[in-house]
């Protein structure tokens, strides 16, 4: 009986200690769960903050890059961009008219002659009459003196200024670039030139432009010395096409693209001819390979030895 009573007391003490330990363990477990939830929330907030900071940093870098290098110009569907596409010659003629009446007073095209326009935008008689309107300093004559004469087809387009110093003095220190190769000299050339000519707008809030400059987001730095030159009805086209800002921009870009690559149509035609000839040669080689040489290659010789 004594032994049984002792055993019962030991069991009661063990059960009592387990009942006391259970709330303590549950308290520690709940505290750990709360700590895990809190640390997860802190990690989520940290990740969110890092993402927002990265996004803001990227936006700042992108804005700074656009301000330094200019806004990326959109892509436009130029008719001469296709593999077998050619220039719009009517647009080239109108673009030359825009260059003469709007651009030639400041920008030169020193690599283009009047004879280059023959068969592209004008007849030979029209080009001769156009060249005769300018005066060219030539010589020396038999007396050793220089003289002036009417222009000829072989003459280059006239220069608006005698030298670079005169050009900078007339344009407030800015030097108008030569336009002969402008669409090849600029990244994304035709799209950039069109976006630049039609992209003038008022500067946004917080941006100040120095006097004598004009805001254009497509120009590196955003400030350009050239004012907006393409305004509706700035020229009167010979063929009656409405001279809107976008139309004049398209035409002058077509003219400048031709000036930079006058051989493009001939190059594309020659490439197509070579591709056609090489395709015929490939078909002929495949024919001989399949029907001629395969027979010889698979031929077997049987040697019959007579005893």
From Swiss-Prot:
Keyword set includes Cell membrane: no
Binding site for heme c: 103, 106-107, 226
PTM: Binds 1 heme c group covalently per subunit.
Keyword field contains Heme: yes
Record membrane topology: Single-pass membrane protein
Mitochondrial intermembrane side: 65-270
Highest taxon of source: Eukaryota
Cytochrome c domain ranges (all copies): 90-246
Mitochondrial matrix membrane side: 289-307
Transit peptide endpoints, chain numbering: 1-64
Keywords attached to this entry: Electron transport, Heme, Iron, Membrane, Metal-binding, Mitochondrion, Mitochondrion inner membrane, Respiratory chain, Transit peptide, Transmembrane, Transmembrane helix, Transport
Any single GO CC term annotated in Swiss-Prot or TrEMBL for this entry: mitochondrial inner membrane
Gene3D superfamilies named among the record's database cross-references: Cytochrome c-like domain (1.10.760.10), Cytochrome c1, transmembrane anchor, C-terminal (1.20.5.100)
Subunit (UniProt): Component of the ubiquinol-cytochrome c oxidoreductase (cytochrome b-c1 complex, complex III, CIII), a multisubunit enzyme composed of 10 subunits. The complex is composed of 3 respiratory subunits cytochrome b (MT-CYB), cytochrome c1 (CYC1-1 or CYC1-2) and Rieske protein (UCR1-1 or UCR1-2), 2 core protein subunits MPPalpha1 (or MPPalpha2) and MPPB, and 5 low-molecular weight protein subunits QCR7-1 (or QCR7-2), UCRQ-1 (or UCRQ-2), QCR9, UCRY and probably QCR6-1 (or QCR6-2).
Function of the protein: Component of the ubiquinol-cytochrome c oxidoreductase, a multisubunit transmembrane complex that is part of the mitochondrial electron transport chain which drives oxidative phosphorylation.
Protein name: Cytochrome c1 1, heme protein, mitochondrial
Gene designation: CYC1-1
């Amino acid at each position: 009986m004594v032994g049984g009573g002792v055993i019962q007391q030991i069991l009661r003490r063990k059960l009592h200690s387990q009942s006391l330990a259970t709330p303590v363990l549950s308290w520690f477990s709940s505290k750990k769960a709360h700590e895990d939830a809190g640390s997860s929330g802190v990690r989520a907030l940290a990740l969110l903050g890092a993402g927002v900071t990265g996004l803001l940093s990227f936006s700042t870098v992108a804005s700074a890059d656009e301000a330094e290098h200019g806004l990326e110009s959109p892509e436009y569907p130029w008719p001469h961009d296709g593999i077998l596409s050619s220039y719009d010659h009517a647009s080239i003629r109108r673009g030359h008219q825009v260059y003469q009446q709007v651009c030639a007073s400041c920008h030169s095209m020193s690599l283009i002659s009047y004879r280059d326009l023959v068969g592209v935008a004008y007849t030979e008689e029209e080009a001769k009459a156009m060249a005769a309107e300018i005066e060219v300093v030539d010589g020396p004559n038999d007396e050793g003196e220089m003289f002036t004469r009417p222009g000829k087809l072989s003459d280059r387009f006239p220069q608006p200024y005698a030298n670079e110093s005169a050009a900078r003095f007339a344009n407030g220190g800015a030097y108008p670039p030569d336009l002969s190769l402008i669409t090849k000299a600029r990244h994304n050339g035709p799209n950039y030139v069109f976006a630049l000519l039609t992209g003038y707008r008022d500067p946004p809030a917080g941006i100040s432009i120095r006097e004598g400059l004009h805001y254009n987001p497509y120009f590196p730095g955003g400030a350009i010395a050239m004012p907006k030159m393409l305004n509706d009805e700035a020229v009167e086209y010979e063929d009656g096409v409405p001279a809107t800002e976008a139309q004049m921009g398209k035409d002058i870009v077509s003219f400048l693209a031709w000036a930079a690559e006058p051989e493009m149509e001939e190059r594309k035609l020659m490439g197509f001819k070579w591709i056609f000839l090489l395709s015929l040669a490939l078909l002929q080689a495949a024919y001989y390979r399949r029907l001629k040489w395969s027979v010889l290659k698979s031929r077997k010789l049987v040697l019959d030895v007579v005893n």
